[in-house]
Curated annotation (Swiss-Prot):
Organism field: Margaritifera margaritifera (Freshwater pearl mussel)
Tissues expressed in: Nacreous layer of shell (at protein level). Expressed primarily in the mantle with highest level in the mantle pallium and lower level in the mantle edge.
Annotated GO CC locations: extracellular region
Signal peptide: 1-20
Protein name as annotated: Uncharacterized shell protein 9
Protein origin, superkingdom: Eukaryota
Amino acid sequence: MQKLTIFVIFLCCWLVLTMADDYVKKCQHHCDLQLKRCARECHFPFHPYHKECLKICEKTKLHCFRWCAHA
C-alpha cells in the first residue's frame, strides 16, 4: 500500500512538471512571435528610431520570458 502511495505521488509530480514545462515552452514561443512582430514594425519603411525600437523589442521579449518562467 505504501509503495502504491509513493508511486501515485511520483506520477502526479511528474505530470505537473511535464505540463508546466510544456506551458513554459508554449509561452516562450509566444514571446518569440511577439518579438518578430515587434521587429517587423521597427523595420516599417524608414522607422525614425529603428535601433531604439529594436532595443525596446528585445527588452519586451526578456520581460515576457521572465513572466513565462514565473507563471
